[in-house]
């Protein structure tokens, strides 16, 4: 899965692309920077499918539709899922442009994608979530970042609903809960993937400091500009991780 304005498409030998709008009944992306298509191909000899743009809960879709692309990739045979996002920094040691490896998440502000009748073919009714983000994959990301000379942070990601940015009071709440970064995606997809038994890792690009931690007002343009600035490093890291896992 590829988040806001972060794409490794240029490193892939592309076999085919499929637009979400061409799949009957499939949710489509409406956010600038999210192209809304699957890209199928290879990184070296590794077969990959990339979700170039995701759908968000705040776009009005039920949470089960938000994770439908994740479910579909698992049903197509994907065994490992690399989730990325643009996030606001809660940890005051972070700077815009930093990458944060997700060690765990807090997702109590959104409905679980597992609510409702369980589909036993996908996974068990009460799945364990003590290690949502694979320790093995996290070590690989750290190793590859070190080889590339990329500074990598690590921390807890908080998913809120959006689309509005967080208030300073909400930011303080997230920090008290132990969050290091906050955003509007990713955790729900990780839950659905783990339910299906996929191995998951997640990386946040810290595109801005969360509300109340700087004098700047938040806007989506800043998110895109920061993501653009670090896109090359991001591409190098994700490509190296795909080769290594």
PLM feature spans:
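Short Gly/aromatic-enriched secondary-structure transition segments
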Residues: 10-22
């Amino acid at each position: 899965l590829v988040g806001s304005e972060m794409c490794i498409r240029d490193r892939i030998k592309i076999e085919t692309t499929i637009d979400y709008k061409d799949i009957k009944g499939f949710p489509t992306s409406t956010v600038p920077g999210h192209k809304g298509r699957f890209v199928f191909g290879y990184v070296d000899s590794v077969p990959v499918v990339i979700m170039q743009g995701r759908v968000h809960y705040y776009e009005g879709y039920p949470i089960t539709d938000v994770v439908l692309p994740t479910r579909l990739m698992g049903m197509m045979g994907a065994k490992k899922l690399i989730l990325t996002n643009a996030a606001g920094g809660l940890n005051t040691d972070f700077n815009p442009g930093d990458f944060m490896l997700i060690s765990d998440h807090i997702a109590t502000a959104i409905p679980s994608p597992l609510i409702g009748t369980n589909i036993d073919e996908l996974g068990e009714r009460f799945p364990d979530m003590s290690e949502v983000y694979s320790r093995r994959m996290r070590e690989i990301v750290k190793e590859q970042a070190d080889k590339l000379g990329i500074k990598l942070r690590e921390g807890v990601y908080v998913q809120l609903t959006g689309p509005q940015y967080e208030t300073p009071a909400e930011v303080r709440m997230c920090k008290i809960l132990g969050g290091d970064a906050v955003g509007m995606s990713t955790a729900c997809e990780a839950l659905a993937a783990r339910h299906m038994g996929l191995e998951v890792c997640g990386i946040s690009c810290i595109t801005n400091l969360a509300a109340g931690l700087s004098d700047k007002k938040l806007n989506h343009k800043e998110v895109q500009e920061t993501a653009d600035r670090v896109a090359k490093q991001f591409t190098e890291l994700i490509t190296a991780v795909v080769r290594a896992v």
